[in-house]
Amino acid sequence: MSFEVTIIGSNSAVPAHGRNPSAQVVTISDKLYLIDCGEGTQMRFQHCGIKWSKINQIFISHLHGDHYFGLIGLISTYHLLKRIKPLEIFAPAPLLNIINAQLHVGKTTLCYELIFHPTDSNTSKLIYENDEITVETIILNHRIDCTGFLFREKQKDRKINRDKMQEHNISFDYVPELKKGNDIQLKETGESFSNAELTIDPPQARSYAYCCDTAYDERILHQLKNTDLLYHDCTFDKSGVERAKETFHTTTEQAATMAKKACVQKLLIGHFSAKYSDLNILLEEAKEVFQNTELAIEGITFEIPRIAEKVKVVE
């Protein structure tokens, strides 16, 4: 099953230097999930080759315009294209009033069902689940209500060691219990077997955390622990620590420190200030603290493989 993150937009407040406001697409298996929807997201979909008709869930972190000004356009385009499937939006509660006002002024009644799920920035909770993944909110420290999102792959059942089963002449009727991780006792002979004797560890479940916008805040470290891929606010270089504090954003050193303390596999830095035409200074500073850091360059897809020692970059 694939697990990829495509960067659609990674700049902060305004488009600049060919970079666009925040948006990402997470692809897990054949399902696409949109995180944030800044201005110009639809055009970036076309540039990045995103099959955006397959997006059924949209997650909006907060209501600063660079994270949602592209949303009403996307909602309207789905209507014009006669979308049939329901569209779920997970976002701060006031966004529903904004959407309804825009649709009302335009005298538009959507041809598909829009299901709105208000998020709570004061508590971390499970907000979405299907057969493959869960999505939890992350409490972020910003000027207004803001949540990050943690995508977790569900742990697969243990794999049956068929050779061992046959070696001990064990009926496959015991497979359901073994897959749950339980030990078994054979009804036929009374003989007991530990689960470890008859099963193989499943592949480690993968995870992706999106933390933007936020000030440096170690209270979320427990939730980020051992995440395969972390995207973290990195608006300023290390000299901008006071400006970051004033605006509730993060510097290179702070983002890298979060990654290091959380023991993540890989760090993506983004939400770059428009003051930087060259992002190399940000990358270099972050790598001084956490070596396995990449820039969230638009159009790049980051693949999280089954064995997560390395996160592959797909051009």
Regions found by a protein language model. Name each.
Residues 35-38, 55-63, 92, 208-214, ...:
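Active-site neighborhood of phospho(di)ester-bond hydrolases with catalytic His/Asp-centered motifs
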Residues 130-210, 214-222, 229:
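Active-site-proximal loop/helix segment associated with metal-binding centers of metalloenzymes
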Residues 5, 36, 45, 62, ...:
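Divalent metal-coordination and catalytic microenvironments
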Residues 107-119:
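A glycine-rich helix N-cap at a beta->alpha junction
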Residues 1-50, 84-86, 149-151, 158, ...:
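Conserved beta-strand hairpin/beta-sheet module of binuclear metal-dependent hydrolase folds
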Residues 119, 123, 216-315:
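Binuclear metal-ion centers of metallo-dependent hydrolases, dominated by the metallo-beta-lactamase
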